[in-house]
Amino acid sequence: PPRSTRKESSAASDVYKRQGYEGPLYAEISPRTFSVLVRSGSCLSQLRLRRGPAVISDNAMQQLQETTGLVHGGETLDIRDGVGLSVNLMPDEKSGMIGWRARKHAGLIDIDAPRSCAVNSFWERLTEADLVAGGLVLNPDEFYILASREFVTVPQGYAAEMRAYDTRVGEFRAHYAGFFDPGFGMAELGAGQTRAVLEVRSHDVPFLIEQGQTVCRLVYEPMAERPNALYGDTTSTSNYQSQGLRLAKHFLQD
């Protein structure tokens, strides 16, 4: 069965589209934080087609972890219905940052214009000074960009999907655009340590998120065949390879 999600670049700008409609293909575009300019031909979604059982078992993911190394950098490995990923709130050694918080009433984003928006016009930097008792308070309906504590690798014969952690645990949602392509974070392609970017939003009440708290799960799926191009290879322009706190490609970020 097919499965659709937002492109990472539109997700990291907090643009949400509903799925589930059967019939002629439409997209409901609902900006939550920034106003966006789209036009005929603008690319907001991506589609994966699956044949038969798609998700590999936890045992198979454990074997891949032992032979290939799917994630590293966390204190413990939690594989239950996918590989658990936790949030990193330790300040970056160079920038001192722990994340980004979207500004309200910011300008317009042209969805087809990469590197066209000044970061400071749209985002506030979060540092250790923003922590409360070692945690970060997520305010209702504000949008945050954080990073996983773990470094992630997707082997060439697999793809991965990041799924929200059990929504019964906590009133927040982490990561809306969940597709990871083969080659993501692969050292063989020259990638450095690559974290997963987490798009996080609290719902109705303030929510305290703490260092190392599990926020989502990464589920690996076998590819029908090895793709001709891998994420981050010399033929691609990959915005998130070797990433830390990486914003969408529309922003002028070093």
Each language-model region and where it sits:
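Single conserved hydrophobic/aromatic residue that forms the stacking wall/gate
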Residues: 1-12, 16
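Compact, glycine-rich, soluble single-domain proteins
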Residues: 10, 132-178
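Extended, regular secondary-structure scaffolds
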Residues: 17-22, 50-53
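Short, structured beta-strand/loop micro-motifs enriched in basic residues and often containing a Trp
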Residues: 22-30, 124-127, 192-200
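A structural micro-motif recognizing beta-strand termini
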Residues: 29-33, 90-91, 147-151, 165, ...
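Helix-rich terminal scaffold detector
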Residues: 36, 42-122, 171, 175-254
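Conserved, ordered domain cores of eukaryotic regulatory proteins
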Residues: 102-132, 137-149
